[in-house]
Amino acid sequence: MTDYNKLFNLHLEIFDNLTLQTIIAHDKENYYVIKDISKIEYTNYLKVKNDKLPFLKPLKIVKHENHTYFLYNYYENHQSIYEAYDGILKTISLLHKKTAKKVPQPKMAEIKYKKIALIANDRFNMLEMKIRNIELNPVKNDLSWIYLSKYHIILDIKLEIYKMIKRLKMIKDDVEVGINHGFPSQVHFFNNSFISYKYLKEGVIENDLYKVFLDFDSLEINHLEIIDKYLDEKYSKKYFKLMVLFSYLLMCDIEPNYTCASKYIKLTNKISRFMYQFKNYK
């Protein structure tokens, strides 16, 4: 067992284990987070350690027996969920703006849009076949009515996905890419307070924002109010809407059991809320 007192020259007691690599410890005056950092995380940390970005910087770094340990101040419940959500998007936006560079035009992504259209078409055909089987079955039950009553929502996103693909393929502007934090999950953020550099990578900001949104989409908040300020009118909003709806489509299934039906209800409710909140993303 690692002797953290000896490593950091502190008199610490273990308070809680957040993960296998992350613990909370305290002395008489302060609480700390101690994290065992992987080689990838440490390498990525070195790339950004001097940047003026809202990462929580370690108080001390100690290497011991092929391990690298970071010591941080511990802040308990310093942000609400709403503020944390906005903080993630703000950080991603800053990272992109700081490291942005020009890349080929969106028209070069036509192959990707064709692939999305093909996958979406196959998925819609599969769902359509299952719905037709339910409709043709003379015996209806509770599950049948659940799927039939909500299927118009799936038809709505079918039209929207094809419409977004068509409009995106017509846009010829450049798109910015840059270094970002990948797609930090809600659990990752609250448990690690943005002290993980493992997922530092390149990407386009719209891609990161839709993944962050999907992790927070069950929250009963105004997502548009938070996300809108990070997306431009011409390209980003259309791409964001397409990828959220495409992700929802891939999550959708119709099976004769209550577990699947329950997921179907939750998913179609999320889709309805998203379509209403982001109805101006055209």
Regions found by a protein language model. Give the residues of each.
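Regulatory N- and C-terminal appendages and interdomain linkers associated
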Residues: 1-9, 148-163, 264-282
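ATP-binding glycine-rich phosphate-binding loop
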Residues: 2-27
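Active-site acidic catalytic loop and adjacent metal/ATP-binding pocket
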Residues: 22-26, 162-209
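A conserved alpha-helical element in kinase catalytic cores
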Residues: 30-68, 79-94
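A glycine-centered beta->alpha junction motif in the catalytic cores
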Residues: 67-82, 100, 128-136, 248-264
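Conserved kinase catalytic-core helix
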Residues: 78-123
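Active-site activation/catalytic loop segments of kinase-like enzymes and analogous catalytic loops
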Residues: 206-235, 245-273
